[in-house]
Amino acid sequence: MKETNKWSVRDVITTVLLSAVLIVIQLVVNMVCMANDFVSMVLSVGITMFLCAPVYMLMVSRIGKRFVTLIYMTILGVIFLLMGNWFLLPYYVLVGILCEAILWKEGSCQKPKRLTAAWTVASLLYNGVNLLPIWFFWDTYYDFVLASGMEQSYIDSYVRYYTSPGWLAFILLFTTLMGFLGCMVGSRLIRRHFKKAGVL
């Protein structure tokens, strides 16, 4: 789809709907992974970024305009705000701005390499959802976790994984790699299916 700067009502609706799909995927994966502390703390973000990558690439390619990623990240931040994690709203807005900078050059929304770069960076920075609380907003996060009914064992696991340099390095590398691999799958789906079907 040709990239233009003029937004239509259809573009806005499509962006919001696909952003909602991305957020639902993230929430579902998070809920399923909560059954095991290791999977929840170490693997869940990577799994999320892998599964969301094709949808993200489809959304940005389909709309073909600037600020799609920023809108999605802002909506995501608002969801976290409503859940009580207010500090994640400005954080994800900043992540969205960084991704927009990667995609700013005209025609970038149609280039798999640019989309892959943007989502890979987003995948790395998505870990802020777990890192910011322990680094800067522990009291706010601790109150949120207790109010959500989490057990102390969950909190202890969280602290253990995210204060260990080895585990932290693994989590960051795993999440970034999974986001990248998800984009490889997304690129293939777009090339082999969506373009042939006339979606793009």
Regions picked out by a protein language model, each given a short descriptive name:
Residues 1-4, 190-200:
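Short, charged juxtamembrane terminal tails flanking transmembrane helices
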Residues 41, 117-191:
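Membrane-embedded alpha-helical hairpins and interfacial helices in multi-pass inner-membrane proteins
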Residues 2-71:
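Hydrophobic transmembrane alpha-helices
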Residues 30-35, 75-103:
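Interfacial aromatic-anchored transmembrane helix boundaries in multi-pass membrane proteins
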Residues 19-27, 75-83, 122-131:
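Aromatic-anchored segments of alpha-helical transmembrane domains
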Residues 12-17, 46-47, 69-74, 89-90, ...:
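Hydrophobic alpha-helical transmembrane segments
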Residues 24, 92-131, 183:
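Short helix-perturbing small/polar motifs within transmembrane alpha-helices
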Residues 3-7, 62-64, 103-113, 193:
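Membrane-interface helix-boundary motifs at transmembrane edges
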